[in-house]
Regions:
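Patatin-like phospholipase
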Residues: 1-155
């Protein structure tokens, strides 16, 4: 992996390492003392059902209720140290479902979820998570290095 020249090569090597070291098997099991897997499974099933049935009011309530940074201890660093690539599949599925649900709420029009309510919901959601920032320090001496970092992130 240290000799990988691009992300795809590194990812393939990391996945192979996880397969050989047992990380892939660990990833597939929901159970772990490091997070509340029952709560996450329950919330995932609830979000999927509400989205499938188009119950926007309950979906918005459920999202708002569960959108805080460490629901079920999912931000526990231990969960991100067992594998070189990824974490528990349940966490990945849950976060993907939350993201897809937020995308749907943003991109689609719903008669029972007017634009003003949608805007308030996303403003409150943004306040729950805060705002990310990229801070590059070191002044002009690291300017060229920072340019490379920005270019890599942009592409």
């Amino acid at each position: 992996m240290t000799h990988a020249t691009d992300y795809a090569t590194w990812r393939a090597a990391a996945r192979e390492h996880d397969r050989l070291s047992g990380g892939t098997d660990w990833r597939e099991l929901d159970e772990s003392p490091d997070y509340d897997y029952r709560l996450i499974r329950e919330r995932l099933n609830e979000l999927r059902a509400l989205r499938r049935h188009g119950d926007i009011a309950r979906l918005v309530y459920s999202l708002h209720e569960g959108l805080h940074g460490n629901l079920g201890n999912i931000a526990n660093p231990v969960l991100y140290s067992h594998c070189l690539f990824g974490t528990k599949r349940l966490l990945t599925e849950y976060l993907d479902e939350v993201a897809a649900t937020l995308d749907d709420l943003c991109d689609q029009d719903f008669p029972d979820f007017p634009l003003a309510a949608k805007l308030r919901f996303f403003e409150r959601t943004g306040q729950s998570f805060g705002r990310s920032a990229l801070m590059l320090s070191g002044g002009a001496t690291l300017g060229l290095f920072h340019s490379g970092v920005i270019k890599a992130l942009w592409t």
